[in-house]
Amino acid sequence: MADFKPLRVAVVGCGNISGAYGSSLKTKPDVVQIMGAFDVLTDQAKAFANNYGGRVYEKLENVMADPEVELVINLTSHHAHAEVSSMALIAGKHVHSEKPLSTKREDGKKLLELAEKNKVRLSCSPFTFLGESQQTVRKVIHDGVIG
């Protein structure tokens, strides 16, 4: 049986949700290794790296060029998801994006095509903002059943 090597990840976007990801990743050092973090607000990337490990990438391009990074976890603002994920896929990195995958349907299709073309995986967190539960609540309120 071959030795299992942890998946080497970089986090891009170190806002509020990054703490939940960092805490979870840190509990599985045999499965994932945090290589570093990037954020346009460098202090946020520094805080993430101090709390969860890895280096601070000064530029987004440095994350994409790092041959040690196998997976990019995209936690950027919604409007940046497609661009950041696209860069990572083109660089041959697997991508896990926080929801939504993209803000435009055509961008989402392009991401799927890039993942297939570059033989890498693309995943996205469950869509909860406008999920079934929220739609049911909205309908019940709209229909006057409650509220």
Across the structure, where does each feature detected by a protein language model lie?
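Beta-loop-alpha module in the N-terminal Rossmann-like domain of NAD(P)-dependent dehydrogenases
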Residues: 21, 54-114
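Acidic-histidine catalytic/liganding microenvironments
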Residues: 28-29, 66-67, 131
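Short loop/turn motifs at secondary-structure junctions
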Residues: 31-34, 68, 145
